[in-house]
C-alpha cells in the first residue's frame, strides 16, 4: 500500500531509532460532532492502597465520545485509574482517594453519589470475559431488569439492539436461549460489551479487553471500538502500543503512578513531549 503525501510527511518526523518499534500511526481522525467536551475530569486525584500511593495527583480531562487509550508498564497504575472511574476500587480493602474525580461535573466520590446509577452510566468490560452462567438473552437482559424494566417485548428489543451494537446478533440470534458459556472467547467478550451497552451507558471502560483473545477475535473487538466511537466515551487500558495507536484518538501514558503525558495519539507516538514517553514507546524499557 502506498503512503499518501500526508502520511509520508508524518513519518518523516519520526526519528529512525523510534521507527524501529514498528507502531502503526493512523492518519488524524475526523472530529466527532457533539464530542470534545470534558466528560471525566481529574484534579490532583490520587489513589491509595493503605499508605501506598498507586496513582499520584493526576490532572486530566477525558473528552466525550472519543477513544482514549491508557498505556504504561505493568504496575504503573493505569488499571487502578480506570477502575476508579466507576468506583470498582471500592471493593478493595483499604483503598481510598484524595483530590477530585468528576463525571459530568458531579463528584464520583461524593457523599451522595449513587454507585448503582453511576455504574449504569459508566459500564466496564474486564480483561477476561465473564459472562454469567445464564442464557445469552438473560445475560443481556440482566442489567435492564435490575433497573426496573420487566416488559418482555421491551427486553427483547434491548437484547437485539445491544447484540447488534456489539456485532454479535448475526452469530447468536438463533440461540438466545443457549448458555453464554458455550460461546467462544471472542464472542463472550463481545457479549460482555453488549451487556454493558444494554443499560445505555455514557462511558465504556475496557480493561485490557483483548489480552486473552486470539488475533482474529482481537480484530473484531478493535473494529467494534471503532463502530462505537462517536456514540460513547471509550477508555481502554492496553499493553499493546500498536493497538493503542490503531483504536484511540487520545493516549495517556502512566509510569509509577504518574500521568507522564496525555496527548492526541498521533502526537504522542510521533512527537512525544516527554523523554520518558519516547523511551517507553521505542522499547527502551517496558
Curated annotation (Swiss-Prot):
Which keywords are on file for this protein? ATP-binding, Cell inner membrane, Cell membrane, Membrane, Nucleotide-binding, Phosphate transport, Translocase, Transport
Does the entry feature the keyword Cell inner membrane, yes or no? yes
Q: Which residues form a coiled coil?
A: none
Q: Which GO terms describe its molecular function?
A: ATP binding; ATP hydrolysis activity; ATPase-coupled phosphate ion transmembrane transporter activity
Location (main, coarse): membrane
Question: What is the membrane topology here?
Answer: Peripheral membrane protein
The record lists the catalysed reaction(s) as: phosphate(out) + ATP + H2O = ADP + 2 phosphate(in) + H(+)
What role does it play?
Part of the ABC transporter complex PstSACB involved in phosphate import. Responsible for energy coupling to the transport system.
What protein name applies here? Phosphate import ATP-binding protein PstB
Could you tell me which species this protein originates from?
A: Chlorobaculum tepidum (strain ATCC 49652 / DSM 12025 / NBRC 103806 / TLS) (Chlorobium tepidum)
Lineage of the species this protein comes from: Bacteria, Pseudomonadati, Chlorobiota, Chlorobiia, Chlorobiales
Amino acid at each position: 500500500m502506498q503512503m499518501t503525501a500526508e502520511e509520508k510527511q508524518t513519518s518523516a518526523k519520526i526519528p529512525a531509532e523510534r521507527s524501529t518499534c514498528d507502531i502503526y500511526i493512523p492518519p488524524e481522525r475526523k472530529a466527532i460532532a457533539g464530542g470534545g467536551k470534558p466528560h471525566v475530569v481529574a484534579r490532583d486525584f490520587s489513589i491509595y492502597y493503605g499508605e501506598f500511593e498507586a496513582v499520584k495527583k493526576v490532572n486530566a480531562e477525558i473528552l466525550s465520545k472519543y477513544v482514549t487509550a491508557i498505556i504504561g508498564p505493568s504496575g504503573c497504575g493505569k488499571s487502578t485509574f480506570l477502575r476508579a472511574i466507576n468506583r470498582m476500587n471500592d471493593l478493595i480493602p483499604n483503598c481510598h482517594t484524595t483530590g477530585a474525580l468528576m463525571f459530568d461535573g458531579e463528584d464520583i466520590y461524593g457523599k451522595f453519589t449513587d454507585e448503582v446509577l453511576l455504574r449504569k452510566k459508566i459500564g466496564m468490560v474486564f480483561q477476561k470475559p465473564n459472562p454469567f452462567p445464564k442464557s445469552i438473552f438473560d445475560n443481556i437482559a440482566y442489567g435492564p431488569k435490575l433497573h426496573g424494566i420487566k416488559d418482555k417485548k421491551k427486553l427483547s428489543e434491548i437484547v437485539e439492539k445491544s447484540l447488534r451494537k456489539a456485532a454479535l446478533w448475526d452469530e447468536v440470534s438463533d440461540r438466545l436461549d443457549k448458555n453464554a458459556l458455550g460461546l467462544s472467547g471472542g464472542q463472550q467478550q463481545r457479549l460482555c460489551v453488549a451487556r454493558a451497552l444494554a443499560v445505555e451507558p455514557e462511558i465504556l471502560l475496557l480493561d485490557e479487553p483483548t489480552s486473552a483473545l486470539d488475533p482474529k477475535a482481537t480484530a473484531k473487538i478493535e473494529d467494534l471500538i471503532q463502530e462505537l466511537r462517536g456514540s460513547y466515551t471509550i477508555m481502554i487500558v492496553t499493553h499493546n502500543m500498536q493497538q493503542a495507536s490503531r483504536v484511540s484518538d487520545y493516549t495517556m501514558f502512566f509510569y509509577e503512578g504518574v500521568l507522564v503525558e496525555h496527548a492526541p495519539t498521533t502526537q504522542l507516538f510521533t512527537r512525544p513531549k516527554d523523554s520518558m514517553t519516547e523511551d517507553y514507546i521505542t522499547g527502551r524499557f517496558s
